[in-house]
């Protein structure tokens, strides 16, 4: 699990990287929760998602947004963090220009950043959005959403009411050419305490199904 330092728009970016031997292996970028509320690339769900994607055959990277850990810079309310994510994806794409799939997976604040990255990078073929803060951030930029993906949310989320995520899912599901999958975890809070294994299994099942589909699951 190499500890790497990448060049970023605000200076160095601290990251972890696990590769696959196949040059066209699928790749995945994992985005952590809000930096000002304890979010780092070492949060348990980020860490476990990183390893689960690698188990599924992906070259995978997780990293600290600016101002977190050894990443330089300071919190930038999303704009700078999106630039950080784009810089890391640039690095991945330079090393692996022809992946069979390209995933972006984000948790909470990271889900918002991931969906913005999805709009800007046509090479991203699938997304996983876990506990997206649909009550705090505007997702209207997903017009249209360019790829199919998975939303996972807890019914007892104390930060983001499940009804707000349902509205987002309903809006995206009405768009043509994509398929939105939404899984609610009964009793789970925003941090999925005591439910993280269930989240990982849901993501694994979805990713495996998408990558096995002859049409990419779109």
Locate the predicted segments by residue.
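A domain-start/cap signature at the N-terminus of enzymes
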Residues: 1-5
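Serine-hydrolase catalytic machinery in alpha/beta-hydrolase-like enzymes
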Residues: 6-96
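Charged helix-capping and loop-helix junction motifs
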Residues: 44-47, 143-146, 166
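Primarily recognizes the serine-hydrolase "nucleophile elbow" in alpha/beta-hydrolase
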Residues: 83-147
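Short beta-strand/loop motif that positions the catalytic acidic residue
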Residues: 145-146, 150-153, 157
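Acidic catalytic loop of the alpha/beta-hydrolase fold
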Residues: 155-160, 190-191
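Short alpha-helix in the alpha/beta-hydrolase fold that links the catalytic acid
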Residues: 161-171
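C-terminal catalytic histidine-bearing segment of alpha/beta-hydrolase fold enzymes
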Residues: 175-218
């Amino acid at each position: 699990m190499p500890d790497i330092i990448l060049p970023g728009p605000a200076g160095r970016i601290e990251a972890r990287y696990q590769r696959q031997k196949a040059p066209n292996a699928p790749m995945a970028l994992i985005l952590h929760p809000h930096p000002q509320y304890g979010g780092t690339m070492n949060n348990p769900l980020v860490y476990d998602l990183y390893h689960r994607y690698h188990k599924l055959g992906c070259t995978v990277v997780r990293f600290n947004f600016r101002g977190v850990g050894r990443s330089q810079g300071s919190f930038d309310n999303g704009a700078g963090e999106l630039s950080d994510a784009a810089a890391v994806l640039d690095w991945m794409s330079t090393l692996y220009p022809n992946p069979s799939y390209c995933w972006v997976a984000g948790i909470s604040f990271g889900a918002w950043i991931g969906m913005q990255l999805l709009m800007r990078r046509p090479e991203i073929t699938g997304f996983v959005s876990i506990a997206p803060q649909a009550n705090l951030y505007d997702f209207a930029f997903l017009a249209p959403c360019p790829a199919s993906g998975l939303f996972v949310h807890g019914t007892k989320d104390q930060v983001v009411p499940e009804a707000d995520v349902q509205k987002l899912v309903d809006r995206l599901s009405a768009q043509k050419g994509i398929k939105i999958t939404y899984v609610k975890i009964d009793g789970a809070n925003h941090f999925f305490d005591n439910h993280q294994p269930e989240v990982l299994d849901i993501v694994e099942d979805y990713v495996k199904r998408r990558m096995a589909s002859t049409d990419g699951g779109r």
